[in-house]
């Protein structure tokens, strides 16, 4: 699985890798977001046993590296924490025109399974309880 690391929160890349490795039983390549590239060597040390056994690789680069990896035949699924714009570029195509055309036709450029958290859209559950007005 390709894990495209987040740029907004440093810890998310590690969480995403651990989830893919242990919850989904995937071998992973983590492409660090350039904003958090400084964290790559630290994750490399923390995950050294996984890297040594071939379960994880950490790579660096910009959008062109991410696009190349997303299209690589050895990558069978993708996880992204990022923007809707990046998701659309990976799944539907590079330009807004290509994306509109492909969305209308229902023909994604990339047909690999993609999981994504885009724009910090997280579920919130409200459980009835004895809350004060302030709570």
Functional labels for PLM-detected ranges:
Residues 49-135:
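Conserved NAD(P)+-binding/catalytic subdomain of aldehyde/semialdehyde dehydrogenases
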Residues 1-54, 121-122:
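Conserved small-residue-rich beta-alpha loop and adjacent elements
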